[in-house]
Amino acid sequence: MAGASLGARFYRQIKRHPGIIPMIGLICLGMGSAALYLLRLALRSPDVCWDRKNNPEPWNRLSPNDQYKFLAVSTDYKKLKKDRPDF
């Protein structure tokens, strides 16, 4: 047991206890979903600035009808008007 690799020990545990297969699947699904959500936040959020030289304040370049929220229940972004000054 001490010389067995991690993959071999994992495979042996799966063979002994097949009831943990759904748990492993759900854990992998949760980790994948969290990674995809973090990637979405990093690429689409106006709070994240990747290019400080050309776009130092990306939140000022958003138009009122840009939807950056993940879920908007009752807001129709196509009908919004600009109500803030240009900087």
From Swiss-Prot:
One of its GO terms (cellular component) is respiratory chain complex IV. Pfam families: B12D (PF06522). Signal peptide: none annotated. InterPro entries: B12D. It comes from the Eukaryota. Belongs to the complex I NDUFA4 subunit family. This is NADH dehydrogenase [ubiquinone] 1 alpha subcomplex subunit 4-like 2. It comes from Homo sapiens.
